[in-house]
Amino acid sequence: MIHQTETIAAIATAMNNSGIGIIRISGEDAFSIIHKIFKPAKEKDMQQVSSHTVHYGYIMDGDRIVDEVLVLIMKGPHTYTREDTVEIDCHGGMYVLNKTLELILKNGARAAEPGEFTKRAFLNGRIDLSQAEAVIDVINAENDFALKSAVTQLKGSVSEKIRKEREILLEQIAYIEAALDDPEHIEMEGYGETLLPILHDCRADIEELLNSADDGRIMKEGIKTVILGKPNVGKSSLLNALLGQDRAIVTDIAGTTRDALEESLRLNDVTLNIIDTAGIRSTEDIIEKIGVDKAKEYAKEADLIVFVADASRPLDDDDREIIEIIREKKVIALLNKQDLEIAADRKELKDLLGEIPLIETSIVENVGLDAFVQLIREMFYRKEINFNDQVYITNARQKSALAAAKAALAKAEESIAQGMSEDFFTIDLMDAYAQLGLVIGETVEDDLADEIFSKFCMGK
């Protein structure tokens, strides 16, 4: 357990040589520590200077200059942690950064744990848990959608919605408990009928947040994309073309890819997590059959399936089997090898695919790939994304808590509809209230908070 009375310090920038490095100090002794090791170019008492001011000078080890620095003084509670905070802008060499940090620790600070600065911001009430998790998402954002979604959550969009629902539930819980304590003066007859539409609206609002979770996950993590097709249709060539490098082995020998290959790439503002699978066909080879079974399993979990067919060969039962497997998923079909003599019946393929879009490609000649990438973007981002109005859940922990809250409300509604006493459905209301509290950290256990903040980088 972290002791908040201790002053903590850490290097806040990447742990490699760079032009500038930053060291952060937070806690009640931050100013006295910097006073001991910093010599301002113009003499002044660093414990008495105004807040949010920058000071030029030198980090000193006794009489020896360690580095020429800028020191930023920020007085709590108007800081990231709500504690007195110092940030030192040093030269970015790891030796000078570690030497400066060593002096700070020698003079009374403790080395911060991963995420401890943000944990203090949470414990001191500056941010809630959903906002703290958004800090990680901002750091890890790999595309513009992920960044905008994380920044929106960091500003408190999720927190605001959750607090609104909790206030509504708390008001109902308080009324019921007061009525149970004082039935002579507080009327409960017919209250269930009054409560039902309120709970229905709460559940609908939670449902709306839950419905955003898949879009939120895709924004944050990328589109889980599985390439399917029978052997030697160009699946590995497609992966290599998208990556711009030979990641997968490409030969004319069917069945070359037996183990799935996984890669992540960003195409403009679209992030794809691509899995190139073994070719699907009827086979007696035990090892190849395992690869085929794995490919079918990957298809079940995919956000997008890219079905690749070979224009130079007639369609066969293997193609038809794959189309049946993928029919209920989001699919883009590629009729590849357009540079060769065409043998596949395009009309038959279109009839089999139905509403599945088909693009004619020659991957080796880079034909059709631009249309393929554009179609992916349209399929997943065609609706206008308004980050001012729409809130996206991007976190599995938050999704789980919201689902539990929704289930508790549904149970309460069912109890009311069946004419159960207030004692029964009040328990469910309190459960829903607690589950919503988990989203923003109002009811979080210490162990869970420790686990969440341990995922942060050092110095954040």
Task: Identify what each model region corresponds to.
Residues R110, T271-N273, P357:
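Conserved beta-strand segments of alpha/beta enzyme cores
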Residues E288-S312:
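Inter-motif core of Ras-like GTPase G domains
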Residues M1-K148, T152, G156, I332:
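A glycine-rich (often HGG/GG-containing) alpha/beta subdomain
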Residues I59, L196, I305-D319:
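Glycine-rich phosphate-binding loop used to anchor ATP phosphates in small-molecule kinases
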Residues G92, L242, T277, A309-S312, ...:
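Glycine-rich, N-terminal phosphate-binding loop of Rossmann-like dinucleotide-binding domains
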